[in-house]
Regions:
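Conserved NAD(P)H cofactor-binding loop of Rossmann-fold oxidoreductase domains
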Residues: 46-53, 227
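Canonical Rossmann dinucleotide-binding motif of NAD(H)/NADP(H)-dependent dehydrogenases/reductases
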Residues: 1-15
């Protein structure tokens, strides 16, 4: 899965360098890292590459959304500058996954990236549904970031996740027009806020986490879904099958 990732140098105000990168390839991610460090210190990372249940198979979702995220965090965590910060875009979907065991949580959080997809509970006979794969991947993202916050902290840097609900983006439009679209619309209508989110709203939370006002936040997962998860567990929203 290839995603356009933009690297902005500290002196390139209003300019950017774009690179097409396979987020699930260590060689490609390391190439992006070389490009970034060639511009100077890496002071920030925003990782939003991913595929949704309506777009890909379980194996592709685990490769891009789970392994790819671990890979990016591992590589950029080796060079992030003191005072730097990062944000990974996870998903409300990770909050709908039933509880994992303590051992599974630790494995998702700390297994070296290249060994991650060898975990027994991630094998094809265990994860057969794209939505299940997506939920595991996004739960894994927040757990991974919590563990990485310790390592990043040793460099004087911070890392957090945002778990958005349904935000009007091309990916969300694919989901709303896909086989689970009716269920997602029910979730929106039945949520406390009663609407989908906007990219600007997610961006505002991202700005807080990346900037000095978020200086006491690290290893945290910000769930911003208009109350969909609250309604899912404690309201009248039917479970999506």
């Amino acid at each position: 899965m290839k995603d356009v990732i933009v690297v902005i140098g500290p002196w390139l105000i209003g300019q950017a360098i774009a690179a097409t990168v396979d987020a699930s390839s260590r060689e490609a991610v390391h190439g992006l890292l070389d490009t970034a460090t060639g511009l100077g210190q890496v002071t920030g990372l925003i990782h939003a590459a991913g595929v949704s249940p309506s777009q890909a198979s379980p194996s592709t979702i685990l490769n891009v959304d789970l392994y790819g995220t671990a890979l990016v965090l591992e590589e950029f965590g080796n060079v992030i500058a003191s005072g730097g910060s990062g944000v990974v875009i996870a998903s409300q979907s990770g909050h709908r996954l039933p509880p994992l065991t303590a051992e599974q949580n630790k494995a998702l959080a700390t297994t070296p990236a290249d060994d991650l997809l060898n975990l027994p509970f991630l094998q094809p006979d265990q994860v057969t549904d794209p939505l299940h794969a997506y939920q595991i991947a996004k739960r894994g993202n927040s757990l991974r970031v919590m563990a990485e916050a310790v390592r990043w902290g040793r460099r004087g840097a911070r890392i957090n996740t945002i778990s958005p609900g349904i935000v009007i983006t091309p990916l969300a439009k694919d989901e709303l027009s896909g086989p689970r679209g009716e269920g997602y619309r029910r979730m929106i209508d039945s949520s406390p806020v009663g609407r989908a989110g906007t990219p600007d709203e997610v961006g505002s939370v991202g700005a807080l986490l990346m900037g000095p006002d978020g200086g006491f936040l690290t290893g945290s997962d910000i769930l911003m879904d208009g109350g969909v998860t609250a309604a899912y567990w404690y309201g009248d929203v039917p479970e999506i099958q």
